[in-house]
């Protein structure tokens, strides 16, 4: 299953804690953890310092407490935990699926589960709030969608339409018909 993973599993950059101005890059590939740094200093003795790089296999990174400490210091404990999990072979396959496939999967979830999923990451929040998802949900829950309802959904959004009760929906459709009916009468 891991064979379809890209060569680069994770990449991030960061700056050292103050007062340091040094830059760091952490790159996790299928087989290695690559840690790069660039010393930034106004002092003349450090101006000729060349960038550095440390390459470790996943197994070696798991045993290298110094490199793990540096990773936690620069990038934070959550990034360190994520990298350790990648090194142990615990991949986040769900996060790597295409948006269309995820939208199809999410459309089968209960509303409470969609609300919880929305809180897990920025990507899932964007997907859970997308009109594409709510259009799928409305189509699966309604027998037929009239052209008037579809036009209203295009104006207000499918999510808004889904959470609108039937009485409000009828009133909004009536207002929309009156509005566009008046516009048609005014046209020569």
UniProtKB/Swiss-Prot annotation:
SUPFAM superfamilies for this protein: F-box domain (SSF81383)
GO biological process, alphabetically ordered: SCF-dependent proteasomal ubiquitin-dependent protein catabolic process
GO CC, one annotated term: SCF ubiquitin ligase complex
Occurrences of domain F-box (ranges): 91-137
CDD domains: F-box_FBXO36
Coiled coil (residue ranges): none
Domain of life: Eukaryota
One Pfam assignment: F-box-like
Cited function: Substrate-recognition component of the SCF (SKP1-CUL1-F-box protein)-type E3 ubiquitin ligase complex.
Subunit structure, as described in the record: Directly interacts with SKP1 and CUL1.
Name under which the protein is recorded: F-box only protein 36
